């Protein structure tokens, strides 16, 4: 299966999640392409069997990089997607916003989601909880 991962990460927590998912997918024999949303053209999103989108919740919304990318990419009707959301709040407020764009406007089909509440070290890129890698590997095994 060909998987495209699109991410936006200000402090590096989301990038760590993406790197782990990239490795887990490749270990399962999948072809993976990783795109940094702010440095990529949404109009030229590569064709894939599945997409993974990763972004942080910031100020009760989505990080600008991933939000702009998803809003400006073409409709991918019927294509499967999974979501990764990092956030500093008690609830993953970014997931519903991501789903609204992808399932609503882009007519894609969600297959899975995962989120991590980052801790006090979030702005250093070390805010993820202990064991996040194992959780991500198990998460990937559930859909790939």
Where are these regions (language model features)?
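N-terminal beta1-alpha1 ligand-phosphate binding loop
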Residues: 2-26
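Flexible, glycine-rich phosphate/dinucleotide-binding loops
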Residues: 12, 41, 90
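FMN-binding flavodoxin-like domain, especially the glycine-rich phosphate-binding loop
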Residues: 16, 24-28, 33, 47-144
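Short acidic loop-to-helix transition motifs that present clustered carboxylates
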Residues: 35-40
């Amino acid at each position: 299966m060909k998987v495209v991962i699109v991410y936006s990460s200000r402090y590096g927590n989301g990038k760590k999640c993406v790197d782990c998912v990239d490795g887990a997918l490749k270990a399962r024999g999948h072809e993976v392409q990783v795109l940094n949303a702010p440095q990529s053209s949404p109009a030229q999103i590569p064709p894939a069997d599945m997409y993974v989108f990763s972004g942080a919740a910031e100020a009760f919304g989505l990080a600008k990089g991933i939000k702009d990318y998803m809003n400006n990419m073409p409709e991918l009707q019927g294509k499967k997607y999974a979501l990764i959301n990092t956030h500093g709040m008690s609830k993953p407020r970014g997931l519903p916003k991501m789903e609204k764009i992808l399932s609503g406007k882009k007519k894609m089909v969600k297959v899975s989601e995962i989120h991590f509440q980052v801790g006090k070290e979030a702005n250093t890129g070390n805010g993820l909880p202990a064991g996040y890698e194992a959780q991500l590997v198990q998460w990937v095994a559930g859909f790939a």
